[in-house]
C-alpha cells in the first residue's frame, strides 16, 4: 500500500543489475518534461567520480533524470571510473531519448572498486519499459547500502506535490550533502529560486546531523521541478520543504548503523549561530557522550568536556547551564544531583534523548541531531568490505 503522494510527470524503477549479489542496485528516475534543478554535493576533497560529473551536468540547472548505482562508490577509480560513469549516462540517454548532460549520476558503496560496467550497461537495456509512477519503493531499495528502513516522504503545497527519497546510515556528517537525498516536485519554480531553497533547507536539516563524524565521498542532495501543476507560493513551499528535509534527516539518524537512540542537542545563548552549531556538533560527535547515552548514563561531565573542546570563545563554565530534557543537571558551577535519577529514567525509557546547553552570552541557538554508539556499529563497520 502506497502511503505517500506522487508528483505528476515522474517515473522511476529499481533493478538488480549485478553490482550486489542479489539486492536491487540500480535506480533511475525520469521526468516526462525537462526540469529546473538544483543540487549540492559533498565537500570531501576525495569525492567520487559521479560528483565530478554531476557538478558539470547541473551547471545549467536543468535535469531530466537521475541514475544511482549502489554497492560500489566509484571513488578513487581514475580514468576508468570516469569513462564508466559516462558510459552509464550515454547508455541511459539513448534508452530514454534525452541528453546525457541532463542526467545526474550518483554511486554509493565500497570505495576503491571499479563498477562492473558491462553488467550495468546490460541492465540498462530496455529500462524505459520498467519505469512506472508507482516504483518509488523499488527505487529507494535500489540506492540503499546498509540502510534498514525505506526513507520516503511527501507533502502537498497548494496543488503541487513534493516527494523525497533518501538513503544513508553510515559515514554521515554531511557538509554541503553516505547520504543521498532526491526531491521531485510538479511545481513550477525557477532554477535560481530552487537553488536558494535547496541550500537553505539542507543547511537546516542534512547539514545538522551526524552519526559518526565522517563526511562521505559521495553525498548528494538534489531537487527537480517539472512544472506540471504551475506556480506555488514560494514562502510556503520553502517552509514545508524544509520541514520535510528535517524529518528525513532525523530518519537517516534513526536508521544509522548500530543506532539505538537519536540524540537532539540544542545549544543556545551563543554570540552567533555558527558558534552554537560548532558546540552542538561537538556534543553529538563525542564518542564518550554517545556511549553514555547508549548506557543511559546522565554523565553531564562528558557534555561539559565536549562543549569545552569546541574551543569557542563563548564557552565560560561559570555561565553555562546543561540539562537533559529541560531537567537541569549543571548550572553556573552548581551540580543538581537530585535530578540524576529522573534523568537516568528519562534516558533509559526513551529512544530519543534531548540535551540542552545554554551558554548565556548571546541570543543565537542551533539544534543538531546525532546518535549513540553501540556494539552493532563496530560489528557492522569492522568487516564492511568482507560482506560484499
Swiss-Prot record:
What are the EC numbers?
2.3.1.35, 2.3.1.1
Q: Where does the record say this protein resides?
A: Cytoplasm
Family matches, as InterPro entries: Arg_biosynth_ArgJ (IPR002813), ArgJ-like_dom_sf (IPR016117), ArgJ_beta_C (IPR042195)
* Reactions listed under catalytic activity: N(2)-acetyl-L-ornithine + L-glutamate = N-acetyl-L-glutamate + L-ornithine; L-glutamate + acetyl-CoA = N-acetyl-L-glutamate + CoA + H(+)
Positions of the catalytic residues = 178 (nucleophile)
Q: Which Pfam families match?
A: ArgJ (PF01960)
Q: Could you cite one Gene Ontology molecular function of this protein?
A: glutamate N-acetyltransferase activity
The cellular component terms of Gene Ontology attached to this UniProt record, alphabetical and capped at eight, are: cytoplasm
Q: Where does substrate bind?
A: 145, 167, 178, 257, 381
Q: Does the keyword Ribonucleoprotein apply?
A: no
Indicate the principal place this protein occupies in or around the cell.
cytoplasm
The organism's place on the tree of life at top rank:
Bacteria
Q: Which UniProt keywords apply?
A: Acyltransferase, Amino-acid biosynthesis, Arginine biosynthesis, Autocatalytic cleavage, Cytoplasm, Multifunctional enzyme, Transferase
Q: In which pathway does it act?
A: Amino-acid biosynthesis; L-arginine biosynthesis; L-ornithine and N-acetyl-L-glutamate from L-glutamate and N(2)-acetyl-L-ornithine (cyclic): step 1/1; Amino-acid biosynthesis; L-arginine biosynthesis; N(2)-acetyl-L-ornithine from L-glutamate: step 1/4
Task: List, in alphabetical order, the GO biological process terms annotated in this UniProt record.
Answer: L-arginine biosynthetic process; ornithine biosynthetic process
Site, Cleavage: residue positions:
177-178
Which residues carry the site feature described as Involved in the stabilization of negative charge on the oxyanion by the formation of the oxyanion hole?
A: 108-109
Q: How does it assemble?
A: Heterotetramer of two alpha and two beta chains.
User: What HAMAP family would the database entry show?
Assistant: ArgJ
Protein family membership:
Belongs to the ArgJ family.
The name under which this protein is listed is Arginine biosynthesis bifunctional protein ArgJ 2
Q: Source species, please?
A: Clostridium acetobutylicum (strain ATCC 824 / DSM 792 / JCM 1419 / IAM 19013 / LMG 5710 / NBRC 13948 / NRRL B-527 / VKM B-1787 / 2291 / W)
Amino acid at each position: 500500500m502506497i502511503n505517500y503522494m506522487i508528483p505528476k510527470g515522474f517515473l522511476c524503477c529499481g533493478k538488480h543489475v549485478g553490482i550486489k549479489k542479489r539486492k536491487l542496485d540500480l535506480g533511475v528516475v525520469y521526468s516526462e518534461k525537462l526540469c529546473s534543478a538544483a543540487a549540492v554535493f559533498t565537500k570531501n576533497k576525495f569525492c567520487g567520480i559521479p560528483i565530478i560529473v554531476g557538478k558539470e551536468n547541473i551547471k545549467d540547472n536543468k535535469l531530466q533524470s537521475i541514475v544511482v548505482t549502489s554497492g560500489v562508490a566509484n571513488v578513487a577509480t581514475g580514468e576508468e571510473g570516469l569513462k564508466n560513469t559516462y558510459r552509464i549516462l550515454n547508455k541511459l540517454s539513448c534508452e530514454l531519448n534525452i541528453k546525457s548532460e541532463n542526467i545526474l549520476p550518483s554511486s554509493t558503496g565500497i570505495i576503491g572498486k571499479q563498477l562492473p560496467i558491462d553488467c550495468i550497461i546490460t541492465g540498462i537495456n530496455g529500462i524505459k519499459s520498467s519505469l512506472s509512477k508507482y516504483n518509488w519503493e523499488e527505487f529507494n531499495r535500489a540506492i540503499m547500502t546498509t540502510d534498514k528502513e525505506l526513507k520516503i516522504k511527501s507533502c502537498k503545497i497548494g496543488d503541487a506535490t513534493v516527494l523525497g527519497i533518501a538513503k544513508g546510515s553510515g559515514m554521515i556528517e554531511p557538509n554541503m550533502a553516505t547520504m543521498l537525498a532526491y526531491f521531485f516536485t510538479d511545481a513550477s519554480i525557477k532554477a535560481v529560486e530552487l537553488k536558494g531553497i535547496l541550500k537553505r533547507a539542507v543547511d537546516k536539516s542534512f547539514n545538522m546531523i551526524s552519526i559518526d563524524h565522517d563526511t562521505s565521498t559521495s553525498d548528494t542532495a538534489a531537487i527537480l521541478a517539472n512544472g506540471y501543476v504551475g506556480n506555488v507560493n514560494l514562502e510556503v513551499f520553502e517552509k514545508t520543504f524544509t520541514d520535510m528535509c528535517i524529518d528525513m534527516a532525523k530518519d537517516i539518524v534513526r536508521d544509522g548503523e548500530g543506532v539505538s537512540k537519536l540524540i537532539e542537542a540544542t545549544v543556545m545563548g551563543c554570540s552567533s549561530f555558527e558558534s552554537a552549531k560548532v558546540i552542538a556538533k561537538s556534543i553529538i560527535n563525542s564518542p564518550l557522550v554517545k556511549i553514555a547515552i547508549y548506557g543511559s548514563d546522565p554523565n553531564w561531565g562528558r557534555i561539559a568536556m565536549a562543549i569545552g573542546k569546541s574551543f569557542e570563545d563563548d564557552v565560560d563554565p561559570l555561565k553555562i547551564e546543561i540539562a537533559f530534557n529541560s531537567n537541569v543537571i549543571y548550572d553556573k558551577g552548581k551540580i543538581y544531583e537530585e535530578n540524576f535519577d529522573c534523568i537516568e529514567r528519562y534516558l533509559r525509557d526513551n529512544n530519543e534523548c534531548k540535551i540542552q546547553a545554554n551558554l548565556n552570552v548571546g541570543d543565537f541557538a542551533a539544534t543538531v541531531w546525532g546518535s549513540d554508539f553501540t556494539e552493532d556499529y563496530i560489528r557492522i563497520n569492522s568487516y564492511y568490505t568482507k560482506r560484499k
